[in-house]
Design a protein with these regions (language model features):
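Left-handed beta-helix
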Residues: 1, 155, 181, 188-359
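Conserved N-terminal catalytic core of the sugar/cofactor nucleotidyltransferase
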Residues: 1-8, 16-22, 29-30, 34-109, ...
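Active-site glycine-centered loops adjacent to acidic/histidine catalytic or metal-binding residues
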Residues: 12, 111, 138, 227
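Alpha-helix/helix-capping structural signal
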Residues: 12, 59, 180-181, 229
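A structural signal for short hydrophobic beta-strand segments in well-ordered beta-sheet cores
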Residues: 28, 148-150, 215
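Short internal beta-strands
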Residues: 51-57, 136, 311, 329
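Conserved beta-strand termini and adjacent loop/short-helix elements that scaffold enzyme active sites
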Residues: 81-83, 135, 216-218
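Conserved core of the sugar-phosphate nucleotidyltransferase
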Residues: 114-190
Length: 359
C-alpha cells in the first residue's frame, strides 16, 4: 500500500458548545491546555503520515490556519481545504478528493480524541488492505451516532446514521481509514433526510458492492468533545497522564500535591494546587485553591477563589468567590468577580445561548 495521507475535518458550527464557539472554532477549544485539533495532527504524525489536509469552514477557517500553521511544528505538511457548507462527512471526502488523489487515507474528526493514537491501526490497515477500516465502541446512547451491525466479529453488515431504534450499541468512532474506492461510493449516494451525504451511506455502498470493510472495536477511551460534559471528561482523561513539572514560581506558603504541571512564568502566592492539573505560562494564583482535573491556560488570574474540574481559557480571571467553582468552562478573557459592597446581588451580562448555573 502506498503512503497514506491524512484528512482532518475541522468545519461545522459547534452549536453544542455555544457560546464558546460564537468566537472560536470548536476544534481549537483546549483540553489540558492544548487545542483538541492538535491531538489529531500529532496522532497522524506519530503514525508516519506526513501530508495532512484540513477541512475548514468559511466562518472559522482563518483562525484554524493561524493557530495550526503550515504543519512544520508537528513535522507534517498541512493543506487547507475549504468546504463552503457542512453537507456531510462524505461531502467533505469529495471536497478533499483533489488533495487526496489516488492515495489511501485516514480521516479524523477534528473534535475527537482517541486514547493511544492511531499508529497500530494504520499498520493494521496497511497489512490487511481492506477498502475501509472503521472504529467502533459501545455507547449508552447509540441513537446519537452512526451505528454498525456486524456479521460475527470481522465483517460489517449494515451502517445507519443516528437511527431512531438502534439495532446495536456499536457507535462509529470519529476515525476512518479508506482506499480511493470511497470517492466512487460517495458520488453514488444520495443526500439523507437531513440533506447531507452521510459517510455511513458511503461505507454501506462499499459493503453492498462486496468490498471489504473491516471493523475494529476500540478498547481504550474515545471522546467526541462537542458538548461541555464531554470536553470536561476529555480534560480529565488527558490530565490523568499529565507530566509532573514545575517551571514556574512558588512562594514558601504555596504547595503542590500530586501530578501538576506549572509552566514557566506562572506564579503561585499562598495557594494550593492539587493534581492532576496544569497551570499555563504567565498565570497567577493568589490566595486560592485549584483542585484536580483543572486546566488553567496562559495569562489567567485566580485570586481568593476555589476552582476544580474546570477549564479556563487564556486571559480569564476569577476573583473573590465565596464558593467553589467546578465543572465549568470559561472562554478567553472572561472575568468572574464578586463585589463585596452591600446589598449583595447578582449582576450579569450574558450573551445569546449562554448558560449560568447557581448552586
Amino acid at each position: 500500500m502506498e503512503q497514506l495521507r491524512g484528512l482532518i475535518l475541522s468545519g461545522g458550527k459547534g452549536t453544542r458548545l455555544r457560546p464558546i464557539t460564537h468566537t472560536s472554532a470548536k476544534q481549537l477549544v483546549p483540553v489540558a491546555n492544548k487545542p483538541v485539533l492538535f491531538y489529531g495532527i500529532e496522532a497522524m504524525a506519530a503514525a508516519g503520515i506526513k501530508e495532512i489536509g484540513i477541512i475548514i469552514a468559511p466562518e472559522t477557517g482563518e483562525e484554524i490556519k493561524a493557530v495550526a500553521g503550515d504543519g512544520s511544528r508537528f513535522g507534517v505538511q498541512i493543506t487547507y481545504i475549504l468546504q463552503d457548507e457542512p453537507l456531510g462527512l462524505a461531502h467533505a471526502v469529495l471536497t478533499a478528493e483533489p488533495f487526496l488523489r489516488d492515495a489511501p487515507f485516514v480521516m479524523y474528526l477534528g473534535d475527537n480524541l482517541l486514547q493511544g493514537g492511531i499508529s497500530e491501526l494504520v499498520e493494521r490497515f496497511r497489512t490487511n488492505a481492506p477498502e475501509a477500516l472503521i472504529l467502533l465502541t459501545p455507547v449508552p446512547d447509540p441513537e446519537n451516532y452512526g451505528v454498525a451491525e456486524l456479521n460475527g466479529s470481522n465483517t460489517v453488515k449494515r451502517l445507519v446514521e443516528k437511527p431512531k431504534e438502534p439495532a446495536t450499541d456499536l457507535a462509529l468512532v470519529g476515525v476512518y481509514m479508506f482506499t480511493p474506492e470511497i470517492h466512487t461510493a460517495a458520488r453514488a449516494i444520495e443526500p439523507s433526510a437531513r440533506g447531507e451525504l452521510e459517510i455511513t451511506d458511503a461505507i454501506q455502498h462499499l459493503v453492498d458492492a462486496g468490498r471489504r470493510v473491516e471493523p475494529h472495536i476500540v478498547t481504550g477511551w474515545w471522546k467526541d468533545t462537542g458538548r461541555l460534559e464531554d470536553m470536561l471528561e476529555a480534560n480529565r482523561l488527558i490530565l490523568e497522564n499529565v507530566e509532573q513539572r514545575i517551571d514556574g514560581e512558588l512562594d514558601a506558603a504555596s504547595q503542590v500535591e500530586g501530578r501538576v504541571c506549572i509552566e514557566a512564568g506562572a506564579r503561585l502566592v499562598r495557594s494550593t494546587v492539587r493534581g492532576p492539573a496544569i497551570i499555563g505560562a504567565g498565570a497567577t494564583l493568589t490566595d486560592c485553591y485549584v483542585g484536580p482535573y483543572t486546566a488553567i491556560a496562559e495569562g489567567c488570574a485566580i485570586e481568593r477563589a476555589e476552582v476544580e474540574h474546570s477549564i479556563l481559557l487564556a486571559g480569564s480571571s476569577v476573583c473573590g468567590l465565596d464558593g467553589r467553582m467546578e465543572s465549568s468552562l470559561l472562554g478567553r478573557n472572561v472575568a468572574i468577580r464578586r463585589d463585596d459592597r452591600q446589598p449583595r446581588a447578582y449582576r450579569f451580562m450574558v450573551g445569546d445561548n449562554s448558560e449560568i448555573g447557581i448552586l
